[in-house]
């Protein structure tokens, strides 16, 4: 079990039944906001995929995927998704979406190697979204514009929740602060990446840390990223300061996706050249898929943040270590 944060004197502001009502309101409101702001159309999404397609998310490349075999397909092995990062781009190409339009899904995933704590669960639920762009829009400026659109939707959600549930009032900044991972390392060279995130997010309350995945001048990465969906020069994480837990709290990871050149370069840098033979990777390398931008926005993360919950298990049902359940109960945190 990872380190558990137990806020002193914690008491949930909403009881379980009211929490469930609030969760529905948050999800209904935000998905409409984000669909309108980014011009997205809702689509159904897979729970599992064929590993031979290369469509599953490899995350940091070391996490084991949940898999099983299908009796009626000669025991063919399939994998439960870890995210839909690559699947969404494939769908945009398959259905010939035009620049400026895209999709969002309710993504449900299982990550069996997740280290469980207040904000990490084996079960992951998020709005996974993807939008077609032009080659000319593969710029930092376009990335920032998209981050601002998402942040405005989050700000509108904050105002909505404050009206609906004043007992869990949240005040977030009018604007999000942008900084690159290298600028952050230059500011705090003696600190580890997570410590840097803590300081910058505590100061600015809402931050987009960009350019994640490649090596910094120190020779270390800010954080790991799979080499086959985000362009490491055009991606980042949206972080909010969570004052219930006293931590930098990630609500979204997103980026402009790799073109053929970035895919080629990053596969080699990551030592993943074996993926070049997978269907998805061949399509990107051969310029057969549209340019796109996309990401994931945590559903339970947003609910947890705006309802001022101390544990993600207060807003979704999962399996937790017995000692975690017991310790949470003793400190006023009731896991569903």
Identify the meaning behind each predicted range.
Residues 105-191:
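Extended, charged alpha-beta segments that form solvent-exposed binding/catalytic grooves
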């Amino acid at each position: 079990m990872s380190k558990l944060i137990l806020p002193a004197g914690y008491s949930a502001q909403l009881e379980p039944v009211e929490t469930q009502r609030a969760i529905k309101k948050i999800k209904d409101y935000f998905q409409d906001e984000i669909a309108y702001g980014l011009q997205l159309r809702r689509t159904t999404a897979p729970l599992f995929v064929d590993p031979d397609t290369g469509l599953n998310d490899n995350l940091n490349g070391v996490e084991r995927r949940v898999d099983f075999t299908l009796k009626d397909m000669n025991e063919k092995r399939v994998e439960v998704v870890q995210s839909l990062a690559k699947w969404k781009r494939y769908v945009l190409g398959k259905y010939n979406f035009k620049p400026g339009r895209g999709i969002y899904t309710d993504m449900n995933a299982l990550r069996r190697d997740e280290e469980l704590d207040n904000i990490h669960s084996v079960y992951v639920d998020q709005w996974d979204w993807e939008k077609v762009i032009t080659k000319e829009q593969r710029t930092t400026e376009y990335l920032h514009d998209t981050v601002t659109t998402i942040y405005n939707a989050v700000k509108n959600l904050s105002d909505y929740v404050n009206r609906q549930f004043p007992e869990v009032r949240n005040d977030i900044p009018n604007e999000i602060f942008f900084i690159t991972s290298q600028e952050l390392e230059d500011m705090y060279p003696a600190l580890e990446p997570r410590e840097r995130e803590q300081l910058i997010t505590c100061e600015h309350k809402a931050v987009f840390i960009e350019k994640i995945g490649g090596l910094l001048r120190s020779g270390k990465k800010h954080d790991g990223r799979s080499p086959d969906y985000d362009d490491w020069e055009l991606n980042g994480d949206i972080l909010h300061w969570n004052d219930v837990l006293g931590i930098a709290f990630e609500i979204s990871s997103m980026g402009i996706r790799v073109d053929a050149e970035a895919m080629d370069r990053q596969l080699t840098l990551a030592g993943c050249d074996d993926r070049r033979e997978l269907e998805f990777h061949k399509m990107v390398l051969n310029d057969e898929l549209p340019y796109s931008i996309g990401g994931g926005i945590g559903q339970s993360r947003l609910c947890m943040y705006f309802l001022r919950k101390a544990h993600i298990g207060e807003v979704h049902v999962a399996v937790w270590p017995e000692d975690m359940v017991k310790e949470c109960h003793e400190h006023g945190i009731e896991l569903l």
